[in-house]
């Protein structure tokens, strides 16, 4: 039984980061740091949550090991995608500046408009697999919701992309996490009553 705490945390962190970034764009201000750095900070409690949950497990099944590797692969994939995107931005920045200098206006192509679909594609994969493997429909549908939003964000502006990313985090992780946590509490009460 997963406690759901990790899913709640990641759903909240990604939703908050997306909504704060949207607010920065909408209202024309800038925080002194990139709000998405909170995701790096969130790795620390995730490690502690994972260690605590592993200690509470009496037996580690094949399914548990399989899920651990799926989510580890997801984390590595996200890290690599961020690295690739930052590498592309480091090359694209000077090209865009030169274009502006030569033409007198910004390039009609904005690379950041195409980042959200990539993240939503990745968000959906382990979420969908976990939901299907664990027969937990809220997470299965959350993964599917990420993929629908992935397709939509190809055709929308960055502001809509950020709203859909926040909605995806809520649908894929926050709500399923809350439901898992509720089931976990019920399970723990039942286990406690059996050992009385």
Name each model-derived stretch.
Residues 126-196:
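Terminal transmembrane helical module of multi-pass membrane proteins
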Residues 22, 26-30, 54-58, 90-98, ...:
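Transmembrane helix-loop junctions in multipass membrane proteins, especially transporters and channels
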Residues 2, 27-34, 59-66, 104-115, ...:
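Membrane-interfacial loop-to-transmembrane-helix junctions in polytopic alpha-helical membrane proteins
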Residues 70, 74-139:
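Membrane-proximal helix-loop-helix units in multi-pass membrane proteins
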Residues 2-88:
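Selected alpha-helical membrane-embedding segments in polytopic membrane proteins
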Residues 13-17, 41, 45, 123-126, ...:
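Membrane-embedded alpha-helical transmembrane segments of multi-pass integral membrane proteins
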Residues 10-24, 43-49, 109-120, 160-168, ...:
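Hydrophobic alpha-helical transmembrane segments
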Residues 4-11, 75, 117-120, 124, ...:
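Residues within membrane-spanning alpha-helices of integral membrane proteins
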């Amino acid at each position: 039984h997963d406690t759901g705490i990790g899913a709640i945390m990641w759903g909240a962190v990604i939703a908050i980061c997306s909504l704060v970034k949207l607010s920065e764009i909408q209202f024309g201000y800038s925080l002194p740091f990139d709000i998405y750095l909170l995701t790096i900070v969130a790795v620390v409690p995730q490690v502690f949550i994972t260690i605590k949950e592993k200690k509470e497990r009496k037996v580690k099944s094949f399914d548990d090991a399989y899920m651990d590797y799926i989510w580890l692969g997801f984390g590595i994939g996200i890290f690599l995608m961020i690295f690739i995107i930052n590498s592309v931005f480091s090359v694209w920045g000077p090209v865009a500046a030169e274009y502006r200098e030569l033409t007198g206006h910004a390039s009609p192509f904005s690379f950041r408009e195409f980042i959200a679909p990539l993240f939503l594609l990745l968000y959906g994969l382990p979420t969908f697999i976990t939901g299907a493997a664990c027969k937990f429909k809220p997470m299965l549908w959350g993964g599917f919701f990420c993929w629908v939003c992935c397709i939509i964000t190809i055709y929308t502006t960055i502001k809509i992309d950020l709203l859909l990313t926040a909605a995806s985090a809520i649908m894929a992780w926050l709500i399923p996490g809350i439901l898992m946590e509720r089931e976990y509490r019920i399970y723990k009460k039942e286990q406690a009553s059996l050992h009385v």
